Swiss-Prot record:
<dbReference type="InterPro" id="IPR033121">
    <property type="entry name" value="PEPTIDASE_A1"/>
</dbReference>
<dbReference type="InterPro" id="IPR001969">
    <property type="entry name" value="Aspartic_peptidase_AS"/>
</dbReference>
<dbReference type="InterPro" id="IPR033874">
    <property type="entry name" value="Memapsin-like"/>
</dbReference>
<dbReference type="InterPro" id="IPR001461">
    <property type="entry name" value="Aspartic_peptidase_A1"/>
</dbReference>
<feature type="disulfide bond">
    <location>
        <begin position="345"/>
        <end position="397"/>
    </location>
</feature>
<feature type="active site">
    <location>
        <position position="302"/>
    </location>
</feature>
<dbReference type="GO" id="GO:0004190">
    <property type="term" value="F:aspartic-type endopeptidase activity"/>
</dbReference>
<keyword id="KW-0064">Aspartyl protease</keyword>
<dbReference type="GO" id="GO:0005886">
    <property type="term" value="C:plasma membrane"/>
</dbReference>
<dbReference type="GO" id="GO:0005802">
    <property type="term" value="C:trans-Golgi network"/>
</dbReference>
<protein>
    <recommendedName>
        <fullName>Beta-secretase</fullName>
        <ecNumber>3.4.23.-</ecNumber>
    </recommendedName>
</protein>
<feature type="domain" description="Peptidase A1">
    <location>
        <begin position="81"/>
        <end position="435"/>
    </location>
</feature>
<keyword id="KW-0865">Zymogen</keyword>
<feature type="transmembrane region" description="Helical">
    <location>
        <begin position="483"/>
        <end position="503"/>
    </location>
</feature>
<dbReference type="GO" id="GO:0050435">
    <property type="term" value="P:amyloid-beta metabolic process"/>
</dbReference>
<comment type="similarity">
    <text>Belongs to the peptidase A1 family.</text>
</comment>
<dbReference type="GO" id="GO:0005768">
    <property type="term" value="C:endosome"/>
</dbReference>
């Protein structure tokens, strides 16, 4: 599943075109740049996280503690995590996918064979049609529909309701997933990537502007690290996979959901939740690439994408390094496993978890908010080897949860990585926080954890400016915009040709007239001189 928007802010610089016509040099310079629209965010009073952890979330009508927001999201491996919302008057209950990689709030508004219910806007007395068509393509799937507004409530926030922009999905392609149990998507990104444009206020902006809820939320998604009491992670021959449980804290943090110190990465920009990756290690060995390679053309934290996605060169490097670690223990891993096209189904394992022992940990280093420092996310094999079940052969299998990015989508820290951590989206202070999740603690107690549990290190010094690792989009190349720029330049040139021809004709005519005039004068002077020479000399 990959519901990150294929959006890239591009600044295209078209080189000057020099065209010479009849020794006249014409230079046409065209620059094309995408427009940036900004919707001001509501900014509350400055507070430290110590003040928000475990405190009540204040709204216009009720007080809700973050303690009451535990286990309010559910998910299924590979199909995303969702939260229950009430929409309209009277309320209609729907489940929506939690997606930090997009910014539109959209729900099904017509029947579909992959969903059990949908939003009936004609039955809501508070629905308002905005008369705007919206279409959102993702790197996987797309949907289109009509933009409107209605009252929305999040069940775990009590009876608090607010007016939100809602896209009523009337058509979709490869968007709704069988057995996913969600009927819409909750985009939690910034206004800049909202569709059709940034004038559409995103869900979380509406929530914080209409209530006194602080501009922060956090996600704990347990996934592969939950105990067997909380989930049955692989599909079974007896039925579909069970759901996993997690928590979404809105307006504050729950200290009981993480261990140790929270480490923060600064937001590079407010569109996606973009951070900067400074290095990747397999086991103890760095991939050794220029750090700009890791962030080509961005690195984002995206709950709506299942896998860890990496730029092609980085994907090839990390895959080769993992192969080198595992080949001596598991020489028969099919090549299609590494590309995600096939499952790995061990036949001689004494335990369905044994392959975890032969795969290395991965370490993702991120820029820290502490100047001149970075911190590490240590990723367990349990996270990037997703358990799956082969119904045909009735085997426990594994799927490689690292994939190459497509269409310059950049690096995506998806759900399989986030599942090891308590992840904080501190919009008010423009940073993303990571701490070790309490989810692994459950499986440690029951003895079901295998391999290295996810870890997070303290911030450490680096001898370079991490900001230099960010990809410079100001020199990015977009063929479509470049072609448009050249077409406009050609139109300008066509318009200039008549002016140039007229100017040249005028100059030529002027010079020709001047030459004819000088020719008459010279001829007259020669005639006079000739007459003078032929006259008789009157001197004695």
């Amino acid at each position: 599943m990959h519901f990150s928007l294929p959006t890239s802010r591009i600044v295209v610089v078209v080189p000057a075109a020099a065209i010479c016509i009849v020794c006249v040099l014409i230079e046409t310079c065209t620059a094309a740049r995408s427009h940036v629209y900004t919707i001001p965010l509501r900014k509350g009073k400055e507070t430290s996280f110590a003040e928000t952890v475990g405190e009540p979330v204040r709204t216009n009508q009720v007080n809700v503690s973050v303690e009451e927001q535990k286990n309010n999201i559910r998910g299924r491996p590979g199909l995303g995590y969702y939260i229950e919302v009430d929409i309209g008057t009277p309320p209609q209950k729907l489940n929506v996918l939690i997606d930090t990689g997009s910014s539109n709030f959209a729900v099904a508004a017509s029947s579909h064979n992959a969903i059990s219910t949908y939003y009936r806007r004609n039955e809501s007395s508070t629905y308002e049609d905005q008369g705007t068509y919206v279409k959102v393509p993702y790197t996987q799937g797309e949907w289109s529909g009509d933009l409107g507004q209605d009252l929305v409530q999040i069940a775990s926030l009590g009876n608090q309701s607010f007016q939100a922009n809602i896209a009523a999905i009337t058509e979709s392609k490869m968007f709704f997933l069988n057995d996913s149990r969600w009927q819409g998507i909750l985009g939690l990104g910034y206004a800049e990537i909202a569709r059709p444009d940034s004038s559409v206020e995103p869900f979380f902006d509406s929530l914080t502007s209409q209530t006194s809820i602080q501009d922060i939320f956090a996600l704990q998604m347990c996934g592969a690290l939950a105990s067997t009491n909380d989930t049955n992670l692989g599909s079974s021959a007896d039925g579909p996979v069970e759901e996993v449980i997690g928590s979404m804290n809105i307006g504050g943090l729950d200290a009981s959901l993480y261990h140790g110190t929270m480490q923060y990465a600064p937001l590079r920009d407010e569109w996606f939740y973009e951070v900067i990756m400074t290095d990747i290690r397999v086991g103890n060995d760095s991939l050794g690439l220029d750090c700009k390679e890791y962030n080509f053309d961005k690195t984002i934290v995206d709950s709506g994408t299942t896998n860890l996605r990496l730029p092609v060169r980085v994907f090839e490097a990390i895959t080769n390094a993992i192969k080198a670690h595992t080949t001596k223990h598991m020489p028969d891993v099919p090549s299609e496993f590494w590309t995600g096209m096939n499952l790995m189904c061990p036949t001689d394992s004494t335990s369905p978890y044994e392959p975890y022992h032969w795969f290395p940990t991965l370490t993702l280093d991120l820029q820290s908010t502490n100047q001149g420092q970075a911190f590490s996310l240590v990723v367990s094999p349990q996270q990037y080897l997703r358990r799956d079940y082969d119904h045909e052969d009735k085997k426990n299998c594994f799927k490689f949860a690292i994939a190459p990015s497509t269409n310059h989508a950049g690096a995506v820290i998806g759900a399989v990585i986030m599942e090891g951590f308590y992840v904080v989206f501190d919009r008010e202070n423009k940073r993303v926080g990571f701490a070790r999740s309490t989810c692994p603690g459950a499986c440690e107690k029951t003895g079901t954890c295998v391999g290295n549990s996810p870890l997070i290190t303290e911030a450490f010094n680096i001898d370079f400016d991490a900001s230099d690792c960010g990809y410079d989009r100001s020199t990015s190349y977009d063929p479509a915009l470049t072609i448009t720029a050249y077409v406009l330049a050609a139109i300008c040139l066509v318009c200039l040709i008549p002016v140039i021809v007229f100017a040249l004709t005028h100059q030529i005519n002027k010079r020709c007239k001047g030459r004819r005039g000088r020719g008459v004068v010279n001829h007259h002077r020669l005639d006079q001189e000739g007459l003078a020479e032929n006259e008789p000399n009157s001197d004695p």
